[in-house]
């Protein structure tokens, strides 16, 4: 508000660029998320910008008028761009925008100058770094969430060893992914998409239960058959907000209401968790509380790593090849 007040006398058009998304259904106004991660609708409602450019959700919004502010959001991965034009009419600017593909042609420069570097990177990505006792095929999102994921078990094992924590949680990208043997750096970076570092949080049993309840809300029973809840699919696909745990034994009962589905929680060997507090290793992304895990924000941080997970995973595979898959979780889901 202060920025708008300060600059208003000098601006014909005010534009806010925000690394955020839309927390409400832009057609109905229904609240979709209150995590604080997405606040574009609040900005449009409470601040008097002419244009609001967002880019967090990877959700296409070609152009929409919200509370007198023109808002837009391009899709992910630079496949398209938004061309926004304004026309001054009757003392104000009216906007329209079009979504335009970037096309397949490029200029000769800097392409030619950068090509040797690109070639070297591609060769490095394809160098073998180790082997698995068996390749991991691409894992269906629902099946992995219901029955467990070998890929997630591998990532959690890396996190446990690197951090020394008692428990660990990790997530996977939106697309079904596996890991072939021999393993290459390309394979690792495709399997673990994010440049996350590690954080160890001090958590209680109550916090662990809240986190697992959030995971259990991923499922929706339709005629007694588990499906993926639309809250993880709309307004954008968020499979990466379902977490896989290690060091624990837990059971979800999907017949129970969301928020009361965790009916068993113990250590991996079945013994009680104990008094606590406990050390939970997670990503720096999840530690901020994003994705519906707001309670993590209040947890004390015991340790922060500075090496990204793809590099840690490659280091682990190199040091322990051939990789035998750990059994680091007991997960049971009832429906």
What is the predicted role of each segment?
Residues 35-128, 216-220:
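Active-site-adjacent helix-turn-beta-strand microarchitecture at beta-sheet edges
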Residues 15, 52, 56, 86, ...:
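Divalent metal-coordination and catalytic microenvironments
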Residues 154-157, 162-166, 171-335:
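Feature captures C-terminal
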